[in-house]
Amino acid sequence: MTLCDTGPMVALANGRDAYHMSCVNALKSFSLSGLVTTWPCLAEAMYILGRAGGWRPQEKLWGLVSDGLMQVHVPRQEELDRMRELMRKYSDTPMDFADASLVAASETLEQRRVFTTDSHFYVYPQKQGAAFEVVP
């Protein structure tokens, strides 16, 4: 299983994105069927894609979800509480809502690998102190 941040979703769905090829190539290193994202990351990606290219790239992203190639993790109350705690802790970085959701999901799902174009994941540790394995 690989957690998927906003950046790769945008890059995969938008061929003009600067990270498109590196994200496409990164997919070859792990199973696409093992991608998991969060609602905040999916919403952020849909917003960015809508502004950048409208419905066509959004439709590509919907395809990943509807075809079962990417699952959307739904948080429990404990994760929401953890997200608030994380955003407070990293307010000087700052940590946004989508990143907080991914860190909290990683702790719940006990997963360290994150597919991201965001360098903040080199700063954020999991609650257990483990560092993320960042792809690409």
Regions found by a protein language model. Give the residues of each.
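Amphipathic alpha-helical segments within well-ordered protein domains
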Residues: 10, 43-46, 84
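Short glycine/serine- and small hydrophobic-enriched flexible loop segments
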Residues: 47-50, 107
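Alpha-helix/helix-capping structural signal
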Residues: 7-8, 40, 78, 119-120
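Short, well-structured N-terminal submotif of metal-dependent ribonuclease cores
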Residues: 1-37, 50-61, 128-129
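Active-site neighborhoods of divalent-metal-dependent phosphate/nucleic-acid chemistry enzymes
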Residues: 72-114, 119
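Acidic, PIN/NYN-like endoribonuclease modules and their adjacent C-terminal/linker elements
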Residues: 1, 109-136
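Conserved beta-strand segments of alpha/beta enzyme cores
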Residues: 34, 71, 131-133
